[in-house]
Regions:
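An edge-strand/N-cap motif at the start of beta-rich repeat modules
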Residues: 51-62, 70
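Beta-propeller domains
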Residues: 68-105, 138-163
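Bacterial lipoprotein signal-peptidase II cleavage site
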Residues: 18-28
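Conserved beta-strand positions in repeat-built beta-propeller and related beta-rich domains
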Residues: 61-64, 130, 136-142, 181-193
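Post-signal peptide N-terminal segment of mature Sec-exported envelope proteins
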Residues: 13, 26-49
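Structural signature of eukaryotic scaffold interfaces centered on beta-propeller domains
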Residues: 39-54, 94-132, 171-186
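Asp-box/WD-like beta-propeller blade repeats and closely related beta-sheet repeat scaffolds
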Residues: 152-193
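N-terminal export signals
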Residues: 1-20
Length: 193
């Protein structure tokens, strides 16, 4: 009996709430104007861009088990481009053409040495302590490889196998030569185990 009464009361309230007429407000003194909302840190940022509008920034993200690098526009988050590195990509012919097979590495029979990867930790090159936009590197955690990406064309142009390593996870380029202060750009990429 209690459940039936509660169900009937809920149904009555639900039907009453569906009324299109606004409820009559009691006559009262005019209320003070509502305070303006406090500005937030991202109040001016609009993440929706109309067709033809360009993003302010572009970011590079590792693709994980896809074995590629993603170029994303910011603030929209749109995927602008995929840069295949360690895994074949039939859409652009990566791993299928002779040129890309030469970069990826092949077995004596001409087949690719590896067809799986796990990209992590993308880093760009430096000059004068700032990013110079020349190269980026990304590592393949599964097969102990590192790929270099030319940032003028957004293509992978070199893959290096690291001997005697299994599962290295992080990489970081140097900002300057530690011995010669005249060399103020990236000359090496360090890999952490």
């Amino acid at each position: 009996r209690f459940i039936n009464t509660a169900a009937l009361a809920g149904l009555t309230v639900g039907v009453a709430a569906c009324n299109d007429k606004p409820a009559a407000a009691p006559a009262a003194a005019p209320a003070a104007p509502a305070p303006a909302p406090a500005p937030t840190a991202h109040a001016g940022a609009n993440v929706h861009l109309k067709p033809g509008e360009l993003d302010t920034y572009y970011g590079l993200w590792s693709g994980g088990h896809n074995g590629d690098v993603r170029v994303l526009g910011l603030p929209s988050g749109r995927e602008i481009h995929r840069i295949p590195c360690f895994v074949p990509d039939a859409l652009v012919g990566w791993g299928i053409t002779n040129e890309s097979k030469a970069v990826m590495g092949t077995k004596p029979d001409g087949n690719l040495r590896y067809t799986v990867a796990d990209t992590h930790h993308l880093h760009a090159s430096y000059k004068d302590g700032n990013y110079d936009g020349r190269y980026a590197w990304v590592n393949d955690k599964i097969n102990a490889r590192i790929a270099r990406i030319r940032l003028d064309y957004f293509v992978c142009d070199k893959i290096t196998d690291l001997p005697n390593v299994q599962g290295f996870h992080g990489i970081f380029p140097d900002k300057a030569d530690p011995v010669d202060p005249a060399i103020n750009y990236t000359t090496r990429v360090f890999c952490g185990g």
